[in-house]
Curated annotation (Swiss-Prot):
Stretches assigned to the EF-hand domain: 144-178, 193-228
SS bonds (residue pairs): C31-C42, C36-C52, C54-C84, C58-C77, C66-C98
Quaternary data: Homodimer. Interacts with SCN10A. Interacts with DIP2A; DIP2A may act as a cell surface receptor for FSTL1. Interacts with BMP4. Interacts with CD14; this interaction promotes TL4-mediated signaling cascade.
Biological role stated in the UniProt entry: Secreted glycoprotein that is involved in various physiological processes, such as angiogenesis, regulation of the immune response, cell proliferation and differentiation. Plays a role in the development of the central nervous system, skeletal system, lungs, and ureter. Promotes endothelial cell survival, migration and differentiation into network structures in an AKT-dependent manner. Also promotes survival of cardiac myocytes. Initiates various signaling cascades by activating different receptors on the cell surface such as DIP2A, TLR4 or BMP receptors.
PANTHER family hit by this protein: FOLLISTATIN-RELATED, FOLLISTATIN-RELATED PROTEIN 1
GO biological process, one term: endothelial cell migration
Signal peptide: 1-20
Domain Follistatin-like residues, every copy: 30-53
Top-level taxon in the UniProt lineage: Eukaryota
Name of the protein this chain belongs to: Follistatin-related protein 1
Stored CDD domains: EFh_SPARC_FSTL1, KAZAL_FS
Record: glycosylation sites: N144, N175, N180
Residue intervals of the Kazal-like domain: 48-100
Length: 308
């Protein structure tokens, strides 16, 4: 009896494999003479017609390059994919990590987690968790994706049925590949980057804005089929894409994951504000003003969506 079931299972696997091969051959045939350009790939529509879309996922080989926007990418593909997704022109400036800017002038930028950093960390976490899936056997029960997430959630939850940023970070640190995001040349900034990207992941699915994730929010955050939205920053009735910059005196503010992040340097000389140097209180007020613009834009967007 078991031989018959085994033969049936093998037959089903063979049929699925043949269908996958046929779909692949069909796509290869339709897209044979289609050139989509860097950062894009050919896909087949429901009507069987070719179309060019931003690359869904690059191969994870590590060959860092510095983009013309000053950001370090894991490889050429990630750079061109980011350019496609953001609709901006980004070129390879040079191979390797972007060099650290030592100037304390307005060119100095705050350490931030861009959407591409956040999405790369999320991709690595999902890849790690999917590798732990164990299919059901003939006489044993395996582990599906939700069960694996539930296991890690319970392991790092302190008992309040919520994961805060420190607990989430400890969870991520269990996997060396997932945590090894090295956008900056020095380890201290990379360590800070990891914490910022964990905060950005929490913000993705934190529906009640308490900066903690329930299991359902945790499940949504790391759901492979969930497509993180592209958030923009608002300022003076204008919207700015991820990576956009603005300056106030000698400080630089960067748009990252929908939020303005600013340096906090004391200004003097030609960057002096009036007859006084910029105080920490003044800088705080400026950042709060930026965030106020952002919140107003988000509320307007939500109201417009409801009216539609």
């Amino acid at each position: 009896m078991w031989k018959r079931w085994l033969a049936l299972a093998l037959a089903l696997v063979a049929v699925a494999w043949v269908r996958a091969e046929e779909e692949l051959r069909s796509k290869s045939k339709i897209c044979a003479n289609v050139f989509c350009g860097a950062g894009r790939e050919c896909a087949v529509t429901e009507k069987g017609e070719p179309t060019c879309l931003c690359i869904e996922q690059c191969k994870p080989h590590k060959r860092p390059v510095c983009g013309s926007n000053g950001k370090t990418y894991l490889n050429h593909c990630e750079l061109h994919r980011d350019a496609c997704l953001t609709g901006s022109k980004i070129q390879v400036d040079y191979d390797g990590h972007c060099k650290e800017k030592k100037s304390i002038s307005p060119s100095a930028s705050p350490v931030v987690c861009y959407q591409s950093n956040r999405d790369e960390l999320r991709r690595r976490i999902i890849q790690w968790l999917e590798a732990e899936i164990i299919p059901d056997g003939w006489f044993s029960k395996g582990s599906n994706y939700s069960e694996i997430l539930d296991k890690y959630f319970k392991n790092f939850d302190n008992g309040d049925s919520r994961l805060d940023s420190s607990e989430f970070l400890k969870f991520v640190e269990q996997n060396e590949t997932a945590i090894n995001i090295t956008t900056y040349p020095d380890q201290e900034n990379n360590k800070l980057l990891r914490g910022l990207c964990v905060d950005a992941l929490i913000e993705l699915s934190d529906e009640n804005a308490d900066w903690k994730l329930s299991f359902q929010e945790f499940l949504k955050c790391l759901n492979p089929s969930f497509n993180p939205p592209e958030k923009k920053c608002a300022l003076e009735d204008e919207t700015y894409a991820d990576g956009a910059e603005t300056e106030v005196d000698c400080n630089r503010c960067v748009c990252a994951c929908g939020n303005w992040v600013c340096t906090a340097m004391t200004c003097d000389g030609k960057n002096q504000k009036g007859a006084q140097t910029q105080t920490e209180e003044e800088m705080t007020r400026y950042v709060q003003e930026l965030q106020k613009h952002q919140e107003t834009a988000e509320k307007t967007k939500r109201v417009s969506t409801k009216e539609i």
